[in-house]
């Protein structure tokens, strides 16, 4: 089901909610007090900037942003050009090599080209303190991103949700399996990838589903912006 509505249309009311204003206020206060928060302020909402609501075909849920210097830029699992792909992304590339004919692992980990094709790379928590995983987990971000998932569920149809790990899979409760296609696997992190992420075939199954429903499949080879122009 296509929708002409934009993120701005469907999230305007949510962004006026007291909890959301408090979340932004808390994050801004930390930045102003000298605490390093990732990603930079201008990048916090990049997932929505690069993948408009009406273009969403696939959702990949992450947890919170990378907390190392220069990594996070607002797209789950993605890192800026020039930053080495982190272990979870390396394992995603390994699964792509095993399941997508012709996939060649790139030296970078910048996934904007996925986002531009309709893959919403959504972390459930949108900020983190430097070096402190899950440090912003209780700030209210999950209330906001749960709303985002429910809006996709409501306004789109036939979206493929890739839910990796128990945290992401809990979000399956928000998604109507009769309207959308839900694929679950262990998380691609080195701690769990060998428990069933490797061999899950999710990238190939996603493209198979999209093609069966008249959608263009995803080109899973990440391309840097200069290469795609």
From Swiss-Prot:
GO terms for biological process: base-excision repair, AP site formation via deaminated base removal. The active site is at 64 (proton acceptor). Keywords: Cytoplasm, DNA damage, DNA repair, Hydrolase. One of its GO terms (cellular component) is cytoplasm. It is an enzyme of class 3 (hydrolase). It is found in: Cytoplasm. SMART domains: UDG, UreE_C. GO terms for molecular function: uracil DNA N-glycosylase activity. Signal peptide: none annotated. Its EC number is 3.2.2.27. InterPro entries: UDG_fam1, Ura-DNA_Glyclase_AS, Uracil-DNA_glycosylase-like, Uracil-DNA_glycosylase-like_sf. It catalyses: Hydrolyzes single-stranded DNA or mismatched double-stranded DNA and polynucleotides, releasing free uracil. Pfam families: UDG. Belongs to the uracil-DNA glycosylase (UDG) superfamily. UNG family. This is Uracil-DNA glycosylase. It comes from Salmonella arizonae (strain ATCC BAA-731 / CDC346-86 / RSK2980). The lineage of its organism: Bacteria, Pseudomonadati, Pseudomonadota, Gammaproteobacteria, Enterobacterales. The gene is ung.
């Amino acid at each position: 089901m296509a929708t002409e509505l934009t993120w701005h249309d469907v999230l305007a009311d949510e962004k006026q909610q007291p909890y959301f204003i408090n979340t932004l206020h808390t994050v801004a206060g930390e930045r102003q007090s000298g605490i390093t928060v990732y990603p930079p302020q201008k990048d916090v909402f990049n997932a929505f900037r690069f993948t408009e609501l009406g273009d969403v075909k696939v959702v990949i849920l992450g947890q919170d942003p990378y907390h190392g210097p220069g990594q996070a830029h607002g797209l789950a699992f993605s890192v800026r050009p020039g930053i080495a792909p982190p272990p979870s992304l390396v394992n995603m590339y390994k699964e792509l090599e095993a399941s997508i004919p012709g996939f060649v692992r790139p030296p970078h980990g910048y996934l904007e080209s996925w986002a531009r094709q309709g893959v919403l790379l959504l972390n459930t928590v949108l900020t983190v303190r430097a070096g402190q995983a899950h440090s912003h987990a209780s700030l209210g971000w999950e209330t906001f991103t749960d709303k985002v998932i429910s809006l996709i569920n409501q306004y789109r149809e036939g979206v493929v949700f890739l839910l990796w790990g128990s945290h992401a899979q809990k979000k399956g409760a928000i998604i109507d399996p009769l309207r959308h296609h839900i694929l679950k696997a262990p998380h691609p992190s080195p701690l769990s990838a060998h428990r069933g992420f490797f061999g899950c075939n999710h990238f190939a199954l996603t493209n198979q589903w999209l093609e069966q429903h008249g959608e263009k499949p995803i080109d899973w080879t990440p391309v840097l912006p200069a290469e795609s122009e």
